[in-house]
Amino acid sequence: PPEGDAGTGMAATNSIALHTGNISAGTSVFAMIVLEQPLSRVYPEIDMVTTPAGRPVAMVHCNTCTSDLDAWVRVFGEMAAAAGANLEKPRLYDILYEKTLEADADCGGLVNINYYSGESVTGLDEGRPLFVRRPGARLTLANFMRAQLYSTMATLRIGMDILFKREHVLLSKLLGHGGLFKTPVVGQRLMA
């Protein structure tokens, strides 16, 4: 289903049973996991909500997900059009996403920070998208696109690590929805 608000995503993915969850990934990104019990303490990175039946749900919400990625896809679309290859937007996304499957696991040393806006999970008040690399990094299209996709997920990982490493939350099924998952396999594989 398309990205929606927290309640819509929970219902649309049927992520209301114990140890299930969903990730909504579009302009912003959030993960919601149904818990056995409330967390042991308050974490500023995690919001607590409930299922319709009242079970506790941990929600990690990040303000920026695909905005920076979308900007780069537009640039590549402009380049393709300038070369006479007018690609439909979904095809352009598929080409660029699928290219990430050829990338180095570490993105060849490329790093992207996708913050278009402030990010409470990392304590930043304002966004500053940033792409960096060392002179010896492997700058390829595959590595560049993987760095872009990883940046959509990196901040979410901070909150998820709190749930799994500090709170020992159990998860048996996690379903993804939203624009990040429109191209089959790629978003799911990298998010996993």
Provide a role label for each language-model segment.
Residues P1-A192:
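Active-site core segments that coordinate phosphate-bearing ligands/cofactors
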